[in-house]
């Protein structure tokens, strides 16, 4: 069946293609949680699945699908590639190819020896081992623990509030010339109403600079100067939509840097290999290559930094002619910046796919990074979180180690076959897997805990 349009809106054609080409390994016993994980993986478009089975004394229950492959096939968008193997036998095969998997998902692993062996294999493979999502559910509680082997880069974070890259404090010559074509002193109110608010904000910044303000611009300063340059046209100006927008978005002019600085800090302070064979995920390597390319461009031109303009302009009150002229300036500048990146890549003989390059340049401000944790798969054994400790005790020793004070709080730990919570975690862990595969949205960093008794959740870094 065809994928829903919603999926393409969430992570785009590039993300969906990554899902279609990915391979996911699910490790664990036959539980409703594992069934939910498989179902959600197939519905997302992942059609290459491996199940490393763990024998478990606990019955899978009547809700578990009798023939997993047969029941999953109708949900798949193409021929389902599916294999089952025994985990213990697989762990004893030194040549087993773990690197072929995009993500490894552990579901309700209750054997300490299996976890220890898998952790040792992961340590030996180093950065070539895929990301691991370890999840466990008991009663009304559960956790998801992400362990990365290499730095994970998010190509498009999709923040809740979109911040446009307008370069109000760092305009290029063509944009300055465009702003200078508007002489407010010779305008009437009708002509003024057709000016984009970004032009008004840049005129305010220019006036502040002429007045000797070389420090950080504040919102109050912007609003005060806006009144100084606009009110001479008449008191009715304050009712014009573009003036109202300029007041509302005055804060956009108060940022020295329109794009996030954390990526520059990463490149400045972090030593990570730019050798392709050291990376498990090609996209991570390509995004790193692009970040290093930006650094090289800045160095070659004696600039503090170089950030490609995204070229996206928000809707605003303006005449059609003024808006189209402004939009074209941003689009032309974005193409020029992208060309500079392509030329630098060619000189360095680095290869990056065109789709990744275009997405990177058009959403540079949304690029994020997550560093591998200092802990490994065994990190869940050495925390001071009472709920996680209780879950781990149930998972590996089948007995919660809780104090008298915690006994009432964790009363829901021993509820068997809580399918609703397992279904929730099946969706949640696959959501994190999709984030890792598509490089869209920011994954958890790196522990997610859920308490179904009081309906609360939290993330921690361990």
From Swiss-Prot:
An example of a GO molecular function for this protein is: NEDD8 activating enzyme activity
Tell me if ATP-binding is a UniProt keyword of this record: yes
Cite the annotated pathway: Protein modification; protein neddylation
Instruction: Please provide the Gene Ontology terms (biological process) for this protein.
Output: protein neddylation
Q: How does it assemble?
A: Heterodimer of UBA3 and ULA1. The complex binds NEDD8 and UBC12.
UniProt family annotation: Belongs to the ubiquitin-activating E1 family. ULA1 subfamily.
> What job does the chain carry out?
Regulatory subunit of the dimeric UBA3-ULA1 E1 enzyme. E1 activates NEDD8/RUB1 by first adenylating its C-terminal glycine residue with ATP, thereafter linking this residue to the side chain of the catalytic cysteine, yielding a NEDD8-UBA3 thioester and free AMP. E1 finally transfers NEDD8 to the catalytic cysteine of UBC12.
Record protein name field: NEDD8-activating enzyme E1 regulatory subunit
Give the organism, scientific name. Answer: Saccharomyces cerevisiae (strain ATCC 204508 / S288c)
